[in-house]
Amino acid sequence: AHATRAVLEGVAFGLRDSLEILQAMGVSLHELRLTGGGAKSPLWRRILASVFGQPVQTLQAEEGPAYGVALLAGVGVGVWNSVPEACAATVQLADTTAPNPDDHAVYAQLYPRYRRLYPALQPFWA
């Protein structure tokens, strides 16, 4: 159980890296939404919310990336005029998971360690 959780936490830290890169590029993110198989896991949702320090929303659609691709295709062929319009017409929220304050405090302390270790370990898989 500990090893599985460690893998999930490592992936969550990697996603936080990506989120911070987007924010550094000036991309404004107001909501974090999950879909697909992993979104069904309460543990995964709690880890993500706690690592990010903000709520994550789960969508009713379970198709994951295929759903997003279908929306993009719909915009491409003129079903909707824009991605925001397509999302407004089709995306429905199922649940919101708030960060656990205790977990968030621990992750906030561990994340800088992850940031130092990640590049140090890179030669082993590069």
Give residue ranges: language-model regions:
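Glycine/Thr-rich phosphate-binding loops that ligate phosphate moieties of nucleotide
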Residues: A1-A126
